[in-house]
Design a protein with these regions (language model features):
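Structural core segment of the AMP-binding/adenylate-forming
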Residues: 47-48, 75-156
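Conserved pre-ATP/AMP-binding loop-to-beta segment of ANL
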Residues: 152, 159-179, 186, 222-230
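Conserved AMP-binding/adenylate-forming core of the ANL superfamily
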Residues: 18-63, 67-71, 88-93
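AMP-binding/adenylate-forming catalytic core of the ANL superfamily
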Residues: 87, 93-94, 104-106, 389, ...
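AMP-binding/adenylate-forming catalytic domain of the ANL superfamily
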Residues: 130, 505-526, 546-551
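Conserved AMP-binding/adenylation subdomain of ANL enzymes
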Residues: 198-278, 293
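Conserved AMP-binding/adenylate-forming
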Residues: 254, 272, 306-430, 435-439, ...
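Conserved AMP-binding A3 loop
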Residues: 30-32, 175-203, 208-210
């Protein structure tokens, strides 16, 4: 036995086979059914020549079959490649070739894109197609018949292969890979040992005291002894946080509610229908429309006792609304990245200091470093780059240059340093400021977009915002904002900044604003800064303020 995703899930199968593991409207899987389907699919992968360490792509929205595919890949000791279902052809080509993908499991609605990219991915030899809820018309079948004919039907792979669990012993050293979102460059595959990722994302370390959990049966035993927890991971499974919400549910005999699309009112209907206990979201992109939906219509949310956000900005003004609406629930804001895993969390209270980004209690292996690699002491007001030691990734897949830049050794200690800047608060907590690669250098001052975005969203008419730097003859760059407002409102930039200046210094406030209908974000809710820069370059600002000679 090993600290391995497939092993943990199998423990739950053995203790609770008749429990429902996965559920959506009109369909479900018990643990026994999940086990049988995943075993059969894993045998199909082996029949296609997949060996331990080979890469298998999953190109799907959140579906029951997507979860079965992930579990099957781990059972076969292969390495899963998470494929963003919103990628255009050039992005798909990059991830197919960069990952050296040998098999792709995809939803039929993506056939046209797969057909166009397949000739450019020489190592991708086999396809397994999942039927989806998008109609399959005759024209599409004729147009892409050469591809669909070569693809194995997902249902056939399950029906025509052994459902026995007769795989070789797995290892702590089996690999888990997570491709980054690519919001600041090409997506990169972050390669982890399974034991390491278990320690930081799979519950293998107590997040409050740092004590390792070494009993591999603990989650299954605890689950079998207690009631069933119902989790609803809303973000796409291309996002690591959402994957791990499902895996942890399956480790402990819980039930994961699975839906392919996000809708604010739909979310609360699902919560009500499935009596959801824990909701997983990614920041304001989901939190704002969800809380607005609750203000528009009353839903039964009495089953909810926790709402957890990760991977994207969760503004304090929005958190306050959740605390008001869910006074007895735990509202959690967690930080981390593909390169670090869990970095810290905070239980939200109303009226917390708004300055900066998320403020969390860091885990024991997270520190702040200066540029020379020395550790900033707790209590210092210096801004440093966040770094994690202990259980961290091995490397980026196929990118030794980037690996050397991110995974560094200082004074004999190996760190993962993805580039997020932060500072300590007087109580030892860490306030996140943002990714250095998108920071704005204005007159020698480094300004982090996330803390400005949070301040802008405190204005009642601002629904969403992305902050970028634009060229400025005097200061090099000036802070600018692309803003989506509520209900067609058009607040003045002066009024927006008046609210923002209650949380951030004046020199951090935007001097120009571009209004748009919606802010483009990744499926995981992260802002697309390249898109924001493109908006500022495509047309004149809707409003620009004069820059004073004295900045405060």
């Amino acid at each position: 036995m090993a600290y391995n995703i497939a092993d943990f899930i199998e423990h739950a199968v053995d203790l609770m086979p008749e429990r429902t593991a996965l559920e959506t409207d009109g369909d479900a899987r018990t643990y026994a059914q999940l086990e049988a389907d995943a075993n059969a699919l894993a045998h199909q992968l082996r029949a296609l020549g997949i060996a331990p360490g080979d890469t298998v792509g999953v190109y799907s929205r959140n579906t029951l079959e997507c979860v079965e595919a992930m579990v099957a890949i781990f059972k076969a000791r292969a390495v899963m490649v998470n494929v963003n279902f919103r990628y255009v052809e050039s992005e798909l080509e990059h991830i197919f070739t960069d990952s050296e993908m040998k098999v792709l499991i995809y939803e039929r609605q993506f056939t046209q894109k797969v057909a166009k990219v397949l000739p450019k991915a020489p190592k991708l030899k086999h396809l397994i197609v999942i039927e989806d809820d998008v109609s399959r018309d005759i024209a599409d079948a004729l147009n892409h018949g050469h591809l669909t004919a070569d693809a194995i039907e997902f249902t056939d792979a399950i029906a025509n292969n052994s459902t026995e669990r007769d795989f070789e012993e797995r290892s702590n050293d089996d690999l888990y890979m997570l491709y980054t979102g690519g919001t600041t460059g090409h997506p990169k595959g972050v390669v982890w040992r399974q034991e390491d990722v278990y320690r930081v994302l799979g519950g293998g370390t107590d997040w409050f005291n740092g004590v390792p959990i070494d009993d591999e049966w603990k989650f299954a035993n605890d689950g079998a002894a207690g009631g069933q927890l119902v989790r609803f991971p809303i973000p796409p499974f291309i996002h690591g946080g959402s994957q791990w919400a499902v895996f942890q549910a399956l480790y402990g005999g819980g039930k994961a509610i699975i839906y392919p699309e996000f809708g604010a009112h739909q979310t609360w209907e699902i919560v009500e229908r499935h009596t959801v206990n824990v909701i997983f979201i990614t920041g304001d992109a989901m939190a704002r429309p969800m809380i607005d939906a609750l203000l528009e219509k009353d839903y039964d949310t009495s089953s909810v006792f926790s709402i957890a956000s990760s991977a994207a900005l969760f503004s304090q003004s929005v958190k306050d609304q959740y605390v008001d609406r869910f006074p007895n629930a735990m509202i959690i804001d967690a930080i981390g990245s593909s390169e670090t895993g869990f970095g810290g969390l905070a239980a939200i209270t109303k009226g917390a200091d708004h300055a900066g980004g998320p403020r969390v209690k860091a885990d024991p292996n997270t520190v702040l470093l200066r540029e020379d690699g020395t550790v900033i002491p707790v209590g210092s007001e210096e801004v440093g780059v966040m770094a994690r030691t202990g259980n961290i990734p091995l490397r980026y897949y196929n990118d030794p240059v980037k690996s050397d830049k991110t995974f560094k050794v200082y004074d004999g200690v190996r760190y993962s340093i993805p580039g997020d800047f932060a500072r300590y608060e007087s109580d030892g907590a860490i306030t996140m400021l943002g990714r250095g690669s998108v920071s704005i250098n204005s007159g020698g001052e480094k300004i982090y977009p996330e803390e400005v975005e949070q301040a802008l969203k405190a204005h009642p008419d601002v629904f969403d915002a992305v902050v970028v730097g634009v060229p400025d003859e005097r200061y090099g760059q000036r802070v600018s904002a692309v803003v989506a407002t509520r209900d067609g409102a058009r607040p003045s930039l002066a009024s927006i900044n008046e609210v923002a200046r209650t949380e951030i210094a004046g020199y951090k406030c935007p001097r120009s604003v571009w209004f748009v209908d919606t802010i483009k974000r990744s499926p995981a809710g992260k802002p697309d800064y390249r898109w924001g820069t493109g908006i500022t370059e495509s047309r004149e600002a809707d409003e620009t303020l004069a820059v004073s000679s004295t900045r405060v």
